[in-house]
A protein has these predicted regions:
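Catalytic beta/alpha-barrel core
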Residues: 1-4, 24-33, 48-58, 126
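Glycine-rich, proline-tolerant flexible connector loops at the mouths of alpha/beta enzymes
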Residues: 1-25, 116-128
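Short beta-strand/loop segments at the ligand-binding rim of alpha/beta enzyme cores
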Residues: 22-28, 45-50, 141-155
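Glycine-rich beta-to-alpha transition loops that act as phosphate-gripper elements at the mouths
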Residues: 28-36, 53-57, 148-155, 161-162
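Active-site-proximal beta-alpha core segment in soluble small-molecule metabolic enzymes
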Residues: 46-76
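Catalytic alpha/beta core domains of metabolic enzymes, predominantly
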Residues: 61, 69-186
């Protein structure tokens, strides 16, 4: 939820209430608005996933207590106030920070889903290699399930479905557990 000019919290509460009655699967709540997040978590009758918690101090301070209060899982995004880490090793360091803060806030091992943070190869030719290495290091250092927005790899490029399916196979081999992807790509 990120529409300007409306009451974000009220809109989130209404959306979560309506959607949760229509689908039998857990919902991921994606907003940067703390009040909207709490409204969504409060309205949701199940265990939600907060998408996402980064290492930015404000995000840690505001979102982690809400995750604990409402029993939500968190999608951990290796992003800090310094921006997007270019290397897998730096992403591990950022992820360690997020997990340490989350555990200090009372979250448990079963509360974490780690995002590998896919960047497009159109802007950085090392993006694919670093993402795959990140997945491998997540498995080695943490053992928590991993996810990522698969199609980000091909943003701005032609023949995206082919690039995405190739990257998908490589990602699975590197330890990806739960891709965020277009199920209609062939």
């Amino acid at each position: 939820m990120g529409v300007g000019g409306i009451d974000q919290a009220a809109a989130m509460q209404k959306a979560i209430t309506e959607i949760s009655q229509l689908v039998p699967v857990p919902l991921a709540i994606d907003t940067s608005d703390t009040k909207a997040l709490e409204a969504g978590l409060k309205a949701y009758p199940g265990r939600a996933l907060i998408n996402s918690v980064s290492a930015e101090p404000e995000r840690l301070a505001e979102f982690l207590p809400l995750a604990k209060k409402y029993g939500a899982a968190i999608l951990c995004l290796p992003l800090s106030d310094k921006g997007v880490p270019k290397t897998a090793s730096r992403r591990i360091e950022v992820m360690k920070t997020i997990i340490a803060h989350a555990k200090k806030a009372g979250l448990k091992d079963h509360d974490f889903l780690l995002d590998a943070l896919v960047m497009t190869v159109a802007a950085d030719e090392d993006a694919c290699k670093e993402t795959l290495h990140t997945l491998q290091l997540y498995r080695k250092h943490f053992g928590y399930p991993s996810t990522m927005g698969l199609s980000n790899i091909s943003y701005g490029l032609p023949n995206r479905p082919l690039i995405n399916s190739t990257f998908f196979a490589m990602s699975l081999a590197s330890g990806l557990d739960a891709p965020i992807m277009n199920p209609y790509d062939q």
